[in-house]
Amino acid sequence: MLLRKYLLVTESQVSKCGFLIVKKKRDVLYPKRTKYSKYRKGRCSRGCKPDGTQLGFGRYGTKSCRAGRLSYRAIEAARRAIIGHFHRAMSGQFRRNGKIWVRVLADIPITGKPTEVRMGRGKGNPTGWIARVSRGQILFEMDGVSLSNARQALH
């Protein structure tokens, strides 16, 4: 499965959650405006940041085991896989009671150049979006589902 390197979190604790203005285009969430159109790649920190490491909305969640980058396609594919499993397992009960929160946002643009292009002439055009994920960060939260259904959806 896509989320093999992530854990299921079950403790209910309150945390601060920052909200960003996002735009949705073709099932992709990305920031409405950024200060610059192109950013540097940067490095992912190895440590654990205190923000976003505790559940804030639901009863269950997925927690990252290590730091890294998640593309907007991976976030959307995981969200669709989780929702699809709940729809199959719980039929109409999930539509009435269940809810999923996506706690990560792909907010950093990634640039790329076409293949077989000579070196130089700038950085390239933005091709996609990524999210930097630190160790211990909550990625998805779920509510209105049982613990067994949540475990099956994430494995």
Swiss-Prot record:
Q: Which InterPro entries match?
A: Ribosomal_uL16, Ribosomal_uL16_bact-type, Ribosomal_uL16_CS, Ribosomal_uL16_dom, Ribosomal_uL16_sf
Q: Which UniProt keywords apply?
A: Mitochondrion, Ribonucleoprotein, Ribosomal protein
The listed locations are: Mitochondrion
Q: List the disulfide bonds.
A: none
> What are the GO cellular component annotations?
mitochondrial large ribosomal subunit
A Pfam family this chain is assigned to: Ribosomal_L16
What superkingdom does the record give?
Eukaryota
Q: Which residues form a coiled coil?
A: none
| Any single biological process term in GO | mitochondrial translation
The protein's GO terms of the molecular function aspect are: rRNA binding; structural constituent of ribosome
NCBIfam families to which the protein is assigned, alphabetical: rplP_bact
Q: Which PANTHER family match?
A: 50S/60S RIBOSOMAL PROTEIN L16, LARGE RIBOSOMAL SUBUNIT PROTEIN UL16M
Q: Which family does it belong to?
A: Belongs to the universal ribosomal protein uL16 family.
Protein name per UniProt? Large ribosomal subunit protein uL16m
